[in-house]
Amino acid sequence: MAASFDYVVVDTWPSFAEAVLTTMDLADDILLVMTLEMTAIRDVRLYLDVVDKLNYPPEKVKLILNRSGSVGGIRVEAVEETLRHKVAVGLANDGPAMLMSVNQGVPLVISAREHAFSRDIYRLTKLVTSVNTDEMAPAQATATPTGATQDAAQATRLMSKLKAAFR
């Protein structure tokens, strides 16, 4: 696949099975997505210990903090100190905006480029690619995918019918 595409993203399952280890060996970067929950932090610590024992360079593993800014009492700095690894990018926590984006069928990075989550996705893109997202033409950043407007209108009509059916 790497011969055919500039970037290949593989979402693996949380294990060190042979297929996962092979994927990790072939990867330029490993994006480890985590949240600020004690169980997730513990699992990340164990993962980083194994990765260290496998002699992967520390810079190959990039911590991505999902739901950044969530209230829960655990500070990012304390987690970084505990893990001895910096969080590379935090992804803003905004459930309502994400739900609206999914229901409308238009990615938030297209419909609301200045939204905190969109800016975080652009930072993540910049981290793993050579794409300078700061210089993207406004037309590229705000273009609507073909049919997305019609899909959003259709979704709105469908939701109206569903609401009416459940009244």
Task: Show where each model-derived region lies.
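Short glycine-/polar-rich loops that comprise or flank the Walker A/P-loop
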Residues: 27-29, 56-61, 84-87
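Conserved C-terminal guanine-recognition region of P-loop GTPase G domains, centered on the G4
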Residues: 20, 41-61
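G-domain G4 guanine-recognition motif of GTPases
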Residues: 34-35, 61-73, 90-96, 111-113
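Inter-motif core of Ras-like GTPase G domains
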Residues: 2-6, 16-38
